[in-house]
Amino acid sequence: MTEFTHINQQGHAKMVDVSDKQITKRTAVAHSSITVNETIFKQISNNTNTKGNVLNTAQIAGIMAAKNTSTLIPMCHPLPLTGIDVHFSWDETNAPLYTLNIQTTVSTTGKTGVEMEALTAASATALTIYDMTKAVDKGMIIGETYLESKSGGKSGDFQRQSNQ
């Protein structure tokens, strides 16, 4: 029978004890995206949105989300993060729809990984862009959010293959 790591002997939720794990450098990279119309693309690119600089605000939201992941995900350990970066790149190949790709990188030196922090950062970044531009068009599409890679820890490294 499989033993669940987040359930105690009484069948109730618990946070995994990581006190015996080795301290290692851990990094995770996550991806999300948001597809917008041409008006929103131009507003973001030209920094003319009435709510302010969309990308700067979304970057800050992503950083804050990574730092606060343990308050959102019940069994996630609070971690001393050593680095958080949010990077944007436009895909203009399907104009008049434009996809903003979001890549987040989170690092720590600790006993557990930062995959959830990277995924939370990517999600919050996309949600913030939606929030700041929804007055223009509510039809935006937040795309797939997934882990691109992780390094460090007992389970080793992971690199998403293009066919995954």
UniProtKB/Swiss-Prot annotation:
Gene3D superfamilies: Molybdopterin cofactor biosynthesis C (MoaC) domain. It is an enzyme of class 4 (lyase). Pfam families: MoaC. It catalyses: (8S)-3',8-cyclo-7,8-dihydroguanosine 5'-triphosphate = cyclic pyranopterin phosphate + diphosphate. Pathway: Cofactor biosynthesis; molybdopterin biosynthesis. Its EC number is 4.6.1.17. One of its GO terms (molecular function) is cyclic pyranopterin monophosphate synthase activity. InterPro entries: MoaC, MoaC_bact/euk, MoaC_sf, MoCo_biosynth_MoaA/MoaC, Mopterin_CF_biosynth-C_dom. Keywords: Lyase, Molybdenum cofactor biosynthesis. GO terms for biological process: Mo-molybdopterin cofactor biosynthetic process. The active site is at D131. Substrate binds at M75, C76, H77, M116, E117. The keyword Lyase applies. NCBIfam families: moaC, PRK09364.1. Homohexamer; trimer of dimers. Catalyzes the conversion of (8S)-3',8-cyclo-7,8-dihydroguanosine 5'-triphosphate to cyclic pyranopterin monophosphate (cPMP). Belongs to the MoaC family. This is Cyclic pyranopterin monophosphate synthase. The gene is moaC.
